Amino acid sequence: MRDYEQKMLQSQNYEDYFWESEDGLKLHCRDFPSDSDATPIICVPGLTRNARDFDHLGDWLDGSRRIIMVDLRGRGMSEYAKDSATYNPKTYVADIIGLMDKLKLPKAVFFGTSLGGIVTMIMAAAHPEKLAGALLNDIGPELDPAGLKRIGDYVGQGCSFDTWAHAARDLAESSGDIFPDFTLKDWIAFAKKIYTMNNSGRIKLDYDMKISEPFDSKGGGSGILWKALESLESTPTLILRGELSDLFSANVALKMLEILKQGVLVTVPRVGHAPTLEEPIALEAIDALLKRIA
C-alpha cells in the first residue's frame, strides 16, 4: 500500500467548503489545507466526474501545497442547476472565479481532466492572471469524434445497482478497454468515485442526468479552444495523454507543444481516457510541474 493511501485510511484530511454561484446555487469543493505559501492547486473534474477523483492528490501532497477539488454544478455535493443550459464551460469558469474570490486566491495552478481541461483553457483566455500553471489531463482543443460518441452514448443514461460489486463489474465490462490492468479492487474504488448511495440504499450515478442536454458530440477542432490555448503559451503546462485514449490524439498533443513554450507532454502507458493521476508516471510528471511553480 502506498503511503498516501494509508493516510487516506487513517483520517479525513480535507474540509468541505460551500459557496454560492451568481445564480444562487450552493456549490461544493474539498479543501486540503497547507501551511505553505506555495501557489494552491484547483482541480476541475471531467464531465460526469466529481471532486473525489482527486482525493489521492491531497494525501500525496501531504500538506506541502494547498489543493482544492471542485464539484462542478450538478455533480457530487454541488446543487443541481435549475436551467440545464448553464451546464457549460463559461458558467463553470464563472463559478470557479466566484470560489477564488470567496477564498481570496489571486491565482492557482489548475489541474483539469477532460472537461476540466477545457474549463482550464477557457479560464486562461478569460482570466490569464489567475493561472500560475496548468495540467491538461487527456484533453486538447481538438477532440476525436470516436471518443465523443462513446461519451455521448452513456452520459445522462441513469442506472443503479444493488451493491458496489455490481457497479464495479458493470464498469469493468463497459470500460475494460480504458483500464486493461485494473483488478476488481481497482474497479470497486473507481465505482466509489463515480457512484453514490441514495436514500433507498441503491448505488446511483453521482450527477444530474441533465448535464447531457447541452453536450456536443460532433467532435473535431475548435478554433476558440486553439485560441484559448495560446493564453497558456508562457505558462508552465503539463499535458498528460493516455496511450489508449480515444478522445485525445497524439497528433493533437504534439501540435499543442508547438504553441506551449513551457509545455511538457507525458504519455501514460496502458491507459485510455483519462488517466486517474494515480499512475506513478503521472505523479512523477505532476511533481516535476509543481517544482517549476512557486
What is the role of each PLM region?
Residues 56, 69-111:
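Active-site loop/oxyanion-hole signature of alpha/beta-hydrolase fold enzymes
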